[in-house]
Amino acid sequence: MKRVFFLSIALFVGLTGCSSAPQTKGAMYLLPKAEPVTLSSSDIAQRPTLVVRPVILASYLNDNGIVYRTSETQVIQAKHNQWAHSISEQITQRVVAELRHKQSHYWPTEMNNLLDQSGEAKLQLTLNKFNGSYKGNIEIEGGMVTH
């Protein structure tokens, strides 16, 4: 009888341990939004348009998983910590908002295939790095081209 009792307890504890194992929940992240700029339509109309093309990301960044560098030579892409929305689109929107805030010569706008923007000035950003680091820093590296 004792043997059956101890076997039952062991089985119960074993099954309870398996069923209460922590389940990893994923988290979704967005970049912080920039403050919107409020200008009159006449102020906007006086500025030449600057078309901000979608940011081009290095291939290892162009996915939903947040990228983290674990050593000088290794990067990993998170499975449970992901971007809630395309990081390329988020960065493009943030660049447009920041340029509207921090300069007054152009009126930055996102590329729009429904409008003829062929004669407008254009800005193309490319990011080779946009990741966290094992040193506790964020790494951002890239370039820009204007037309």
Predicted regions and their residues:
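Bacterial N-terminal signal peptides that target proteins for export
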Residues: 1-6
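Surface-exposed short loop/turn segments
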Residues: 20-39, 102-147
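N-terminal segment of the mature soluble domain
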Residues: 47-115
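N-terminal secretory signal peptides
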Residues: 33-53
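C-terminal motif of bacterial Sec signal peptides marking the signal peptidase cleavage site
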Residues: 14-17
